């Protein structure tokens, strides 16, 4: 027998159907933020074009709320050679919409010449070392306060490879180099997240809109429309993972989970102290001064 929850599910399906008719990309940039010349920088290591949007809530908030300069590197442009030029342009447009900068990695030998996967690290150590050195030069040039990259168990070979390459790139910089690190999750949950970051509906709408600029990918699979559901599930899961079993959910309907640490003395050190939940209306200044 039909009941009120049928109406709820029917409405959810209907809004998804209507959302499929929304334009992909082609939107004017979101309102800009004035960035100081000496502003601290976030550097996102995106395994593929689109990851800068999917796990970009932290970077977006730091950009908008604290004036951080955000730059993204496409560590690869995907496995399809015929799509690489288009994917680079799609990422450029998505970054432009959000107010991020795109750092072209392909002139540095990244973006396709070497498969950024664990087996390459094992089977082609010279090619891997060249890619790590190239990425290290990018990091050294831009000197980020915060480096964002996938965690080491994020299932997808290129996500795991990007983590390994990022760590190896940091090792090329010597023991004096220091920055904060935020590990992300997408294909596989973090084993020990220590930050649940609330995402406002307006920020989420901009992330979904930015993701829609990756037109060639979302036409195949409209995964930009499932980003709100993923972020809603992060609240369900993160509230008890960080707050303890039986903890009440946070105040935000949407969130992203991260693992924060510091790269110092040639290694990644976990963030000291208890895990934290930062609501969309809370300041990030204590974590990212």
Describe the predicted segments one by one:
Residues 249-273:
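Acidic, Ser/Thr-rich low-complexity intrinsically disordered segments
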Residues 77-79, 105-106, 180, 229-232, ...:
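Short, intrinsically disordered/low-complexity patches at protein termini
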Residues 106, 162, 181, 221-222, ...:
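Residue-level detector of alpha-helical recognition elements and their boundaries
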Residues 188, 193-250, 256:
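A conserved mid-domain beta-alpha-beta active-site/ligand-binding segment of alpha/beta enzyme cores
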Residues 8, 102, 124, 226, ...:
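Acidic, low-complexity intrinsically disordered regions
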Residues 171-199:
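Short, flexible loop segments at boundaries between secondary-structure elements
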Residues 1-177, 190, 212-213, 265, ...:
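Active-site beta-strand->loop->alpha-helix modules in alpha/beta enzyme cores, enriched
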């Amino acid at each position: 027998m039909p009941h009120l929850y049928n109406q709820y599910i029917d409405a959810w399906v209907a809004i998804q159907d209507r959302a499929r008719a929304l334009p992909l990309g082609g939107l004017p940039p979101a309102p800009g933020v004035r960035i100081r010349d000496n502003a601290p920088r976030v550097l996102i290591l995106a395994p593929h074009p689109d990851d800068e949007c999917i796990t970009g809530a932290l970077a977006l908030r730091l950009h908008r709320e604290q004036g951080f300069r955000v730059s993204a590197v496409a560590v690869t442009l995907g496995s399809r050679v015929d799509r690489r030029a288009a994917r680079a342009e799609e990422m450029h447009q998505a970054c432009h919409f959000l107010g991020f900068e795109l750092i072209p990695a392909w002139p540095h030998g990244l973006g396709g010449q070497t498969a950024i996967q664990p087996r390459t690290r094992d089977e082609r150590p010279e090619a891997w070392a060249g890619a790590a050195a190239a990425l290290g030069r990018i990091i050294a040039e831009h000197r980020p306060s915060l480096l964002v990259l996938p965690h080491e168990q994020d299932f997808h070979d290129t996500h795991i490879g990007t983590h390994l390459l990022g760590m190896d790139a940091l090792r090329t910089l010597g023991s004096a180099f220091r920055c904060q690190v935020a590990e992300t999750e997408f294909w596989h949950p973090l084993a020990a997240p220590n930050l649940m970051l609330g995402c406002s509906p307006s920020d989420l709408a901009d992330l979904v809109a930015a993701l829609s600029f990756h037109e060639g990918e979302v036409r195949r699979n409209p995964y930009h429309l499932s980003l709100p559901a993923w972020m809603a599930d992060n609240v369900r899961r993160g509230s008890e993972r960080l707050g303890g079993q039986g903890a009440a959910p946070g105040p935000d309907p949407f969130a992203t989970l991260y693992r924060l640490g510091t790269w110092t003395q040639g290694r990644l050190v976990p963030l000291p102290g208890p895990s934290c939940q930062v609501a969309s209306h809370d300041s990030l200044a204590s974590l990212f001064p």
